[in-house]
Amino acid sequence: MTTIKHLAIIMDGNARWADQHNLTKSEGHKAGADKIRELLPEFINLNIPYITLYTFSSENWQRSSSEVNFLIKLLSLYLKNELDSLHENGVKIKVIGRLNLLRSSLQKQINNAIELTQNNNKIKLCIAFSYGSRQEIVDACTKIIANGKKQVSENDIQHALYDPEMPDVDLLIRSGGVYRISNFLLWQAAYAELYFSQKYWPDFNKDDIHEAINDYSKRKRTFGKR
């Protein structure tokens, strides 16, 4: 099986899954969070060292206040309920995005999770929350300018991103039958292979992950070369 160093996933379709099952959007998002718990051991078994999950975009702030508040609460509950298990399983946690927009108590909770797991090396789980890739690049450039740089290189931008250690994305999976990348890791996914699934995220299972990876393994990556 072809080695994947960085798998990124746009976990789309929670609300439509809920509609399909006559459930509330909140129940759909809860099912989506439960799916992360279910699939994480498989990511570890597959020896994929870096996983990035798109959980809440910068554009999602425009949704109803009730949905936004629930998604924020869901992140807090996930960290509260899963942190010990993640730590015991050697998972290193990173959260990227404009986290300054979150309440201070959640920022503290995120920082505590990052600090607790900082020396773990089994797998790095990066949660993209309040995240937009254009915003990340703007923030990186602003940081570079503030440091007095006049000539900017790709290396400068890479080191000013939310996670400078993040490797380029090898495979980007999007569930939910939508064919776009929605302002997600535009810099890091410049040469990523894209895989789109019709399944809604709560219906995803390890066989779907294997199917995506198998499809990826059949592709020839040229990176612009012949």
UniProtKB/Swiss-Prot annotation:
The keyword Transmembrane does not apply. GO terms for molecular function: ditrans,polycis-polyprenyl diphosphate synthase [(2E,6E)-farnesyl diphosphate specific] activity; magnesium ion binding. Keywords: Magnesium, Metal-binding, Transferase. It is an enzyme of class 2 (transferase). Substrate binds at residues 13-17, 25, 29, 57-59, 61, 63, 174, 180-182. Mg(2+) binds at D12, E193. Belongs to the UPP synthase family. This is Isoprenyl transferase. It comes from Rickettsia typhi (strain ATCC VR-144 / Wilmington). The lineage of its organism: Bacteria, Pseudomonadati, Pseudomonadota, Alphaproteobacteria, Rickettsiales.
